[in-house]
Amino acid sequence: MKKLLSIFLLLGFMLLTANISDAAVNSYDQYGRKTGSYRETSTGYNSYDKNGSKSGSYRKTSTGYNKYDKNGSKTGSFRKTTSGYNEYDKYGRKTGSYKTGSNGVTTKYDQYGRKTGSFKKDSSGRVIEYDKYGRKVGSYK
């Protein structure tokens, strides 16, 4: 049964809050070349590079997600807010935020509140990522 994924483009890239109805999601660059994938686990999500090697993980917490590298070391976290998520580094310093509007567009901001990009689902169900100028930089499906 397909489950609703909340993917964070954490960015390092990943953790966006775009909802994709599948247990596995692939990421692509602006030219359509596969760059990685995300798979749902019992505790959250694992991320993989384009060759299928595990590159990190995201584990659910009571307030959001913790982010770990491939060796299991914590590298940051995401905490749920009323409009999306705030992102923090491993020391607890805020590094950015993701806010989803009523139009379904998720906008990414840096720690100073400046827009750095956005995510929007298209008619085919893909989530398209744009930079702050509105140029397509990647997609998720």
Describe each model-derived feature in a short phrase.
Residues 23-141:
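Repetitive, compositionally biased segments used for assembly/scaffolding
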Residues 16-23:
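Sec/Tat signal peptide C-region and signal peptidase I cleavage site
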Residues 1-4:
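Positively charged n-region of N-terminal signal peptides that target proteins for export
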Residues 7-16:
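Bacterial N-terminal signal peptides
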